[in-house]
Amino acid sequence: MTTREFDYIICGAGSAGNVLATRLTEDPGVTVLLLEAGGPDYRFDFRTQMPAALAYPLQGRRYNWAYETDPEPHMNHRRMECGRGKGLGGSSLINGMCYIRGNALDYDNWATHKALEDWAYLDCLPYFRKAETRDVGPNDYHGGDGPVSVTTSKPGVNPLFEAMVEAGVQAGYPRTDDLNGYQQEGFGPMDRTVTPRGRRASTARGYLDQARARPNLEIVTHALADRILFSGKRATGVTFLHGSARVTAHARREVLVCSGAIASPQLLQRSGVGPGEWLRELDIPVVLDLPGVGRNLQDHLEMYIQFECKEPVSLYPALKWWNQPKIGLEWMLNGTGLGASNHFEAGGFIRTRDDDPWPNIQYHFLPVAINYNGSNAIEMHGFQAHVGSMRSPSRGRVKLKSRDPHAHPSILFNYMAEALDWREFRDAIRATREIMRQPALDRFRGRELNPGADLKSDNELDTFVRARAETAFHPSCSCKMGYDDMAVVDNEGRVHGIDGLRVVDASIMPIITTGNLNAPTIMIAEKIADRIRQHKPLERSNAQYYVANGAPARGGKPARAPAVV
């Protein structure tokens, strides 16, 4: 491959990069080079295409960067997982397929920051709708002709889902019919990025399938970006490794970094854009001393609150190898059955205290007791709630350790560094126990398996969190958007102080959103794609949305009072 020129070079074919590649090449006169360090999204590989197989990609390195954190000082010095997608689709190729946009007040809060006024919820909602085709049809909140297929859970899938939602309502929390609609707060069915044929709806399937055949788009897989090239303070191209070759490509207009919250700051730092003292430690020539690159790192931490199930209605039999061929065959031939669901079909968001302005705790309900990555399966019928806080005040960082593009960076989330973190996790455990002991779950609920009913004091719960809490795989905010001293990009993703360079992915979120990050990342890319193309922004929505305004976190007393601790 010889040196080539393109209008735009995109580094990373993930949740954001595929959106940009597809939208930019809608203009036939625009040429785009899309670089992806991983391989194709093989459609015959059940590990990435079958929703129920979501744990498999995290267990290897074909589709997973398999990063690990530095020892986390507040988590028993554990090195914790930080899985990130590798291959066309990026993390949308290996994520849990939960389609959660965040709370409207997340975006309204962004919009209170200097010059981010056009990131308010009603400005973002049209781009959420543009990206989506929802199986039950469009409305003021949902799209009907977008690239990403979204399936919402239907009644009757598993009695545990309906019982867990009803238990939340019996505990005094709201019921909501749509976690992405008028009111996120409450318990209800989950939307999922799954096609009508029961396949994972990654951005490779949804977006790139529209664009692959365009003559103005060149996709190169197994292409690891090494450095961004500069002429003074202008980005002019990228060098990347492709097989044994080092290749240079030039960008006539812009370089677009879409490598995610770990690899985007890593690439910027390796190219000489980042905290000057970090770069000098590795003898990297400083193009721009930009102190926020790699800082402000955020994530969601979660726990598994697990119970024995007294009736044989859980997914426990599906974990047995002798039942899996039948499940796989039905999925492969018909796109139906247990294989066609990620099994996160119900969940919710609550405020644990009345003075929380919007939900601070998320629930994913699952009708089996097992870790997200497929490990530590409980050998009995069981069910669980994945529970975690949404907007931790703790902040971490991504720091380059080597100029070698194959080397992983130093990652420290600094989980649970603040007193509020501990209060919210204790509140979450106690609220979950109260939900689980409501009458709706009486016929199913057996023993509490984790943390264990004997753990009651603050110290005992804190010990459990330190030892057992895990990442929800939502790294973000490490190249934050804004105009303060630690901001990396402006309101259109343009890197401060550099021409011809943008970052467009979850790393530019100023503050993490309330929920899973795939849907917000796609929205961010859709919105910035219009700015790159100099299109007029989509018309602002006038949809109504719920604001608590000091209302009690619970609308009524629980049907069954909490156990005395």
Curated annotation (Swiss-Prot):
Write one Gene Ontology MF term. flavin adenine dinucleotide binding
Catalytic site residues?
A: H474 (proton acceptor)
Q: What are the recorded Gene Ontology BP terms?
A: glycine betaine biosynthetic process from choline
**Mind telling me which SUPFAM superfamilies this protein's record contains?**
FAD-linked reductases, C-terminal domain, FAD/NAD(P)-binding domain
Annotated FAD binding sites:
7-36
For this protein, what reaction is catalysed?
choline + A = betaine aldehyde + AH2; betaine aldehyde + NAD(+) + H2O = glycine betaine + NADH + 2 H(+)
Q: Could you say which cofactors this protein requires? A: FAD
Q: Which PROSITE patterns match?
A: GMC_OXRED_1 (PS00623), GMC_OXRED_2 (PS00624)
Report if keyword Flavoprotein is assigned.
Answer: yes
What Pfam families is this protein classified in? Answer: GMC_oxred_C, GMC_oxred_N
Query: Function of this protein?
Result: Involved in the biosynthesis of the osmoprotectant glycine betaine. Catalyzes the oxidation of choline to betaine aldehyde and betaine aldehyde to glycine betaine at the same rate.
Name the record gives this protein: Oxygen-dependent choline dehydrogenase
User: What species is this protein from?
Assistant: Burkholderia pseudomallei (strain K96243)
